[in-house]
From Swiss-Prot:
Pfam families cross-referenced by the UniProt entry: EFG_C, EFG_III, EFG_IV, GTP_EFTU, GTP_EFTU_D2
InterPro entries: EFG_II, EFG_III, EFG_III/V, EFG_IV, EFG_V, EFG_V-like, EFTu-like_2, G_TR_CS
Compartments it resides in: Cytoplasm
Binding residues annotated for GTP, in chain numbering: 19-26, 83-87, 137-140
Function: Catalyzes the GTP-dependent ribosomal translocation step during translation elongation. During this step, the ribosome changes from the pre-translocational (PRE) to the post-translocational (POST) state as the newly formed A-site-bound peptidyl-tRNA and P-site-bound deacylated tRNA move to the P and E sites, respectively. Catalyzes the coordinated movement of the two tRNA molecules, the mRNA and conformational changes in the ribosome.
Entries under Gene3D superfamilies matching the protein: 3.30.230.10, 3.30.70.240, Elongation Factor G (Translational Gtpase), domain 3, P-loop containing nucleotide triphosphate hydrolases, Translation factors
An example Gene Ontology molecular-function term: GTPase activity
The protein's name: Elongation factor G
Length: 700
């Protein structure tokens, strides 16, 4: 059966389940897997037994860290699910899974409504234009309010929800939903066994008026989307279920609106209709249509690939994972063509050939071997050596480079020191594997102390990376205190600065002269460096120009104030001179490096620090303490609002002031407040703080 469904892309859905950390996303995914026949024993996140949370740390913490790809079937349709994490430190996982999805189910907590992380994940989905349906979960929870949650979708996300179901009862009395498309009640009364089929009933009398009101809104929206339907609607004719579903599907696929359903995944209520909605309203690979890329070595030449088996093979690697038996697993989304195990393909991003060993479709951490990979699907490949996240794989005779992914730089670092020599060796392996898997994990060697310094997106992110080193790679190490990843930049333009590198050591010497201009710069795509060659008339031979650029980029690794990386600058090479015998690539590299350092000192260098967007939710009575505390941490209050009877304070606060914040917040609010924090931007450090940072870095 599986093979038959595979080839008809109308029956394939590549979706993600996206949500805030506690909205019940993993439980929802578990239920989907159970109802689609993959799981026989249901895993609860509370027990640490969930299928998609398959790394040990995830089981312990009850949060989803790695997006595991899972394939399942529903009513003769195939659904490939990417489980995305809901914790803010793992936004890279969310970004990379959204890049390869066709649609998503956004899960909201029926009591809390749209929460901070939901807003962020929603914005990421909008960036990749991913159509979504909304599932208001936890309707059995004390204080659950479906209508409030729908309103938060409008107010906090600025989105247009289309209500397709109304809840029957709430909290302990939540018994089912009113289906507004077919105007019937779908109920699961009492304690529901897992997998139990719902009962179809008449709409309860006390909901008849509300159902009629929301049905009317639904029909108006549907009629407005299509001229024929509008004529029919205004002529008083009944719209068929097929017509209504077709119109909703069209608007959903175009991201004009977002269908809203509700239920309680934990209590097994509302899961089947949500699966039906995935099939009815979310796009298949054919709806998404052709994918764009560019020719190898020429970004201006746009190429396209259709989601067809007949097209040349193209795929995007979106995740690397370590497998206990197979080693490196590369998860790919195939956009066009087909490929067999054992075939050779081109990694167009790196310009290298790769051979595919085996092909699998995954079910969390179980693997199902397949005979071919075809367009429109998600697979795990074994045997790829050089491929990393964001790389394009393609047919050797039809190269294409698909749009890659951009990942933020780490904002927090810790030093890590192996306890023994054998730990030192194991650390090398661990770091290499983890860096392959996670593009936001950075590693550098502190040349002064000889320590290895690792960087990540937050304290939890680094905790988990260190934890994995201990568990998976058996590395025992001492971990230093978290350090902030500062940057340096320039604030003024230096019109002209020249530097001559001259060295005479018997025989041939070294000679290179460069004249440069330096100015502040931020590229449209967020690039933080640009090199422009303005040399004319062969004053510097063409083969030496890249060496000047390379030397400048080397110098940018260590800034001029406190040794932090230099960012956001443009270097223009204006002129220079060379010597027939003494000039070399090395000489021009040194000249480029020294010229940049000297010019940067004259360009008003400053230190930048990461600012975090902090959102604190607190009971009213602690509001003053919370704001006072944020102000004392150099925070800038951005907004205050009321949410679910609590107060929410939004502020931008330097990361350096946020270490240990959770403990302080708990003691100030008797444990009743909570907060979320996500990287926002880099900003200039005040002069007094800058002096402290420089003194600490230079030991003065």
């Amino acid at each position: 059966m599986a093979q038959e469904v595979l080839t008809d892309l109308n029956k394939v859905r590549n979706i993600g389940i996206m949500a805030h950390i506690d909205a019940g996303k993993t439980t929802t995914t578990e239920r989907i897997l159970f109802y689609t026949g993959v799981n026989y024993k249901i895993g609860e996140t509370h027990d640490g037994a969930s299928t998609t949370d398959w790394m040990e740390q995830e089981k312990e913490r009850g949060i989803t860290i790695t997006s595991a790809a899972v394939t399942c079937f529903w009513n003769n349709n195939q659904i490939n699910i990417i489980d995305t994490p809901g914790h803010v430190d793992f936004t890279v996982e969310v970004e990379r899974s959204l890049r390869v999805l066709d649609g998503a189910v956004a899960v909201f907590d029926g009591k809390e409504g749209v929460e901070p992380q939901s807003e962020q994940v929603w914005r990421q989905a909008a960036k990749y234009d991913v159509p979504r349906i909304c599932f208001v979960n936890k309707m059995d929870k004390m204080g659950a309010d479906f209508y409030f949650t729908v309103q938060t979708i409008i107010d906090r996300l600025g989105a247009k929800p289309l209500v397709l179901q109304l809840p029957i009862g709430a909290e302990d009395d939540f018994d089912g939903v009113v289906d507004l498309v077919e105007m019937k009640a779908v109920t699961w009364r009492g304690t529901v066994a897992i997998g139990a089929e719902p009962t179809i009933e008449e709409i309860p009398a006390d909901l008849a008026d509300k159902a009629a009101e929301y049905r009317e809104k639904l029909l108006e929206t549907v009629a407005e989307s299509d001229e024929k339907l509008m004529e029919k609607y205004f002529a008083g004719e009944e719209l068929s279920v097929e017509e209504i579903k077709g119109a909703i599907r069209k608007m959903t696929v175009n991201s004009e609106l977002y269908p809203v359903l509700c239920g309680s995944a934990f209590k097994n209520k509302g899961v089947q209709p949500m699966l039906d909605a995935v099939i009815d309203y979310l796009p298949n690979p054919l709806d998404i249509g052709e994918v764009q890329g560019h020719a190898l070595g020429n970004e201006e030449e746009v190429l396209t690939r259709k989601p067809s088996k007949e097209e040349p093979f193209s795929a995007l690697a979106f995740k690397i994972a370590s497998h206990p038996f197979f080693g490196k697993l590369t998860f790919v989304r195939v956009y066009s063509g087909r490929i067999d195990p054992g075939a050779q393909v081109m990694n167009a991003t790196k310009g290298k050939k790769e051979r595919i060993g085996k092909l699998f479709q995954m079910h969390a951490n179980k693997e199902n071997p397949v005979d071919e990979a075809v367009a429109g699907h998600i697979y795990a490949m074994i045997g790829l050596k050089d491929t990393t996240t964001g790389d394009t794989l393609c047919a050797q005779d039809a190269p294409i480079v698909l749009e890659s992914m951009s990942f933020p730089d780490p904002v927090i670092q810790v030093s890590i020191e192996p306890k023994t020599k054998s730990d030192q060796e194991k650390l090398g392996t661990a770091i290499q594997k983890l860096a392959e898997e996670d593009p936001t994990f950075s590693v550098e060697l502190d040349e002064e102390t000889g320590q290895t310094v690792i960087g990540g997106m937050g304290e939890l992110h680094l905790d988990i990376l260190v934890d994995r080193m201990r568990r998976e790679f058996k590395v025992e190490a001492n971990v230093g205190k978290p350090q902030v990843a500062y940057r340096e930049t320039i604030t003024k333009k230096v019109e002209k600065h020249d530097y001559t590198h001259k060295k005479q050591t018997g025989g041939s010497g070294q000679f290179a002269k460069v004249i440069i201009a330096l100015e502040p710069f931020v590229g449209e795509d967020g690039a933080s460096y640009e090199f422009e060659n303005k040399v004319s008339g062969g004053r510097i031979p063409r083969e030496y120009i890249p060496s000047v650029d390379a030397g400048a980029q080397d110098a940018m690794q260590y800034g001029v104030l406190a040794g932090y990386p230099l960012v956001n600058l443009k270097l223009s090479l204006l002129d220079g001179a060379y010597h027939d015998v003494d000039s070399s690539e090395m000489a021009f590299k040194v000249a480029g490096s020294q010229a940049l350092k000297e010019a940067a000192r004259k360009a008003g260098p400053v230190i930048l620090e990461p600012l975090m967007a902090v959102e604190v939710t607190t009971p009213e009575e602690y509001m003053g303490d919370v704001i006072g505390d944020l102000n004392s941490r150099r925070g800038q209050i951005q907004a205050m609002e009321e949410r679910s009877g609590a107060r929410v304070v939004k502020a931008l606060v330097p990361l350096s002031e946020m270490f240990g914040y959770i403990g302080d917040l708990r003691s100030k609010t008797q444990g009743r407040a909570n907060f979320s924090m996500v990287f926002d931007s880099y900003a200039e450090v005040p002069a007094n703080v800058s002096k402290e940072i420089i003194a600490k870095a230079t030991g003065e």
